């Protein structure tokens, strides 16, 4: 059984700054503290790594990326970083040169685990809020898929499907059809798809492939099926996902690590 974590939509600003009334860096510190305590090597649920599925910063500021790097160094396990629409590839690479990129400079990479192949994709379109995969990125994905014949776990920032929230659905991956054409021959190997961007806990299936997203680390998107001309923000609790992937199951837990609700023995 492989245990790993997902964190998303940090929206860090320069240290000392606030965003929509919140301090994103302080929330990251609390998340790192909680992940290290609950999922460190001596815990009951040690994690192999955390995948951070994009929007690492809000404005792509160098100081924000440097603050991110400093906090992630406190984790007792590796962090795999991805970019979202609020990010800057150049800014991220300048602050954290070790971030893997492909031969064309896209922030995406693949690695193998006991549970299968993990493929982390770059759906960023500079200056635009929606996601997309150009022909170069789709070709890269196709190559990564044929390198292995085992289970595959996919990670991207933008969802490739509509989820019924008008404010979010217009910002999905524009090339979803072409994306699926690359994935379709490998349908039986696709165990799960993880993404961020929505700032909401959503799960379901797309072309039969299970997917899930979680709330962001910073602000959230309120559940409003009628919001068509604005983004209904909220201060709902931040969360991260705890994923347990085995040979015959994938279980995704959402942990509201900032929820002050009292806990007790039943």
What are the residue ranges of the model-derived segments?
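N-terminal active-site segment of His-dependent metallophosphoesterases
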Residues: 1-67, 71, 163
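Active-site neighborhood of phospho(di)ester-bond hydrolases with catalytic His/Asp-centered motifs
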Residues: 6-8, 49-55, 79-85, 122, ...
């Amino acid at each position: 059984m492989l245990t790993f974590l997902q964190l998303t939509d940090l929206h860090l600003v320069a240290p000392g700054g606030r965003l929509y009334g919140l301090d994103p860096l302080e929330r990251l510190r609390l998340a790192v503290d909680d992940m290290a305590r609950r999922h460190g090597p001596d815990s009951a649920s040690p994690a192999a790594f955390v995948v951070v599925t994009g929007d690492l910063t809000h404005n792509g500021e160098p100081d924000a990326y440097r603050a991110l790097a400093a906090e992630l160094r406190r984790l007792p396990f590796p962090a795999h970083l991805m970019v979202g629409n609020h990010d800057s590839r150049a800014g991220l690479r300048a602050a954290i040169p070790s971030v893997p990129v492909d031969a064309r400079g896209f922030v995406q990479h693949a690695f193998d685990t006991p549970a299968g192949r993990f493929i982390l994709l770059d759906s960023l379109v500079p200056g635009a809020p929606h996601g997309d995969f150009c022909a170069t990125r789709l070709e890269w994905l196709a190559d990564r898929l044929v390198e292995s014949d085992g289970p595959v776990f996919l990670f991207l920032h933008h969802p490739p499907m509509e989820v019924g929230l008008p404010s979010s659905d217009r910002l999905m991956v524009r090339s979803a059809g072409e994306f699926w054409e690359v994935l379709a021959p490998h349908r039986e190997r696709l165990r799960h798809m993880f993404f961020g961007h929505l700032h909401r806990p959503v799960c379901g299936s797309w072309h039969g492939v299970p997917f899930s997203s979680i709330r962001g680390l910073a602000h959230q998107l309120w559940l409003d099926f009628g919001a068509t001309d604005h983004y209904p923000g909220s201060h709902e609790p931040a969360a991260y996902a705890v994923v347990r992937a085995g040979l015959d199951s994938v279980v995704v837990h959402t942990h509201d690590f900032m929820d002050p609700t009292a806990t007790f023995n039943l």
